[in-house]
């Protein structure tokens, strides 16, 4: 009987720890509810005519931030190899 009580207590402690971890991860992944109401997917912050996520760019042309997948993401121009001698630069999250 004592073993059963100990196992029950350990399993309850594990469930509680998992719930705390999931709550913490949810807070990290999502911005505050006020930000979610104001921003919509695709909204950007930056100078007029700045490039959005996954658009070809040169250095300094990307928007500062774009709201994607429920979070503000800072953007930067990243160059990816598209061939042996060539590369393609696109705006990606930092």
Swiss-Prot record:
An MF annotation (GO) of this entry: sodium channel regulator activity
Something else known: Negative results: has no effect on the human Nav channel subtypes Nav1.1-Nav1.7, and no effect on hERG (Kv11.1) and Kv2.1. Is non-toxic to mice at 657 pmol/g (4.2 mg/kg) i.p. and 156 pmol/g (1.0 mg/kg) i.c.v.
Effect on the protein upon substituting residue 70 to A: Almost complete loss of activation of B.germanica sodium channel
Effect of residue 84 to A: Severe decrease of activation of B.germanica sodium channel
Physiological role: Insecticidal toxin. This toxin promotes opening of insect Nav channels. The toxin binds to the S1-S2 and S3-S4 loops in the domain II voltage-sensor of insect Nav channels (i.e., receptor site 4). The American cockroach P.americana is largely resistant to the effects of this toxin due to an unusual sequence within the domain II S1-S2 loop. In vivo, paralyzes lepidopteran and dipteran larvae. Paralyzed insects ultimately die from secondary effects of starvation and dehydration.
Protein name per Swiss-Prot or TrEMBL: Beta-diguetoxin-Dc1a
Any one Pfam family match given in the protein's UniProt record, by short name: m_DGTX_Dc1a_b_c
Organism listed in the record: Diguetia canities (Desert bush spider)
Listed InterPro entries: Beta/Mu-DGTX-Dc1 (IPR035290)
Residues the record marks as site: Interacts with insect Nav channel: 58, 70, 78, 81, 85-86, 93
Domain notes: The presence of a 'disulfide through disulfide knot' structurally defines this protein as a knottin.
């Amino acid at each position: 009987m004592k073993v059963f009580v100990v196992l029950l207590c350990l399993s309850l402690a594990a469930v509680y720890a998992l719930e705390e971890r999931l709550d913490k991860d949810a807070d990290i992944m999502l911005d505050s509810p006020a930000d979610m109401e104001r921003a919509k997917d695709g909204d950007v912050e930056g100078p007029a005519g700045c490039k959005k996520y996954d658009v070809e760019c040169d250095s300094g042309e990307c928007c500062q931030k774009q709201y994607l997948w429920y979070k503000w993401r800072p953007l930067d121009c990243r160059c990816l190899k598209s061939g042996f001698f060539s590369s393609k630069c696109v705006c990606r999250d930092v």
